[in-house]
Amino acid sequence: MADYFYVHKKILPDYLEKVLEAREMLDSREAATVTEATERVGISRNTYYRYKDYVFRAKDPARGQQAVLSLLLADLPGALSAVLTCVTDHRASVLTISQAIPLASHASVLMSLDLAGLKGDINTLLADLKSLPFVKNLQLAGLE
């Protein structure tokens, strides 16, 4: 890691961010070819090939790749299903799920999620989960 630096994009030339944009267009299939991607972002193919393997976006700490949620759900039909639907609507994937036997009309659920494909950010997902009528308590137990 001695060869790497974290620097603010403000001090870098604009074309480095355009290299990232071009690579993201190719990865998402928004552009079919390098030529198309570079033309759309306004850099030469030479610039793209020169820097594509050397410039990367820093991971946003608020956008981890895995999360562990602890939920307290009302013991009603469809409660867990509503939670899972909300999770998948945000394009998160359930890695593990553990539901305790309901006590006092509430069930405890521990869920780990893969957030690699998350639409939006973790805060939006948490807010949408909290807004579900079945969810009585929600805690983000961990984020990696």
Swiss-Prot record:
Highest taxon of the lineage: Bacteria
Where is the signal peptide, in residue numbers? none
Q: Which residues form the ACT domain?
A: 68-143
Annotated HAMAP family: UPF0735 (MF_00707)
Give the family from UniProt: Belongs to the UPF0735 family.
Under which name does UniProt file this protein? UPF0735 ACT domain-containing protein Ldb1351
- The scientific name of the source species is Lactobacillus delbrueckii subsp. bulgaricus (strain ATCC 11842 / DSM 20081 / BCRC 10696 / JCM 1002 / NBRC 13953 / NCIMB 11778 / NCTC 12712 / WDCM 00102 / Lb 14)
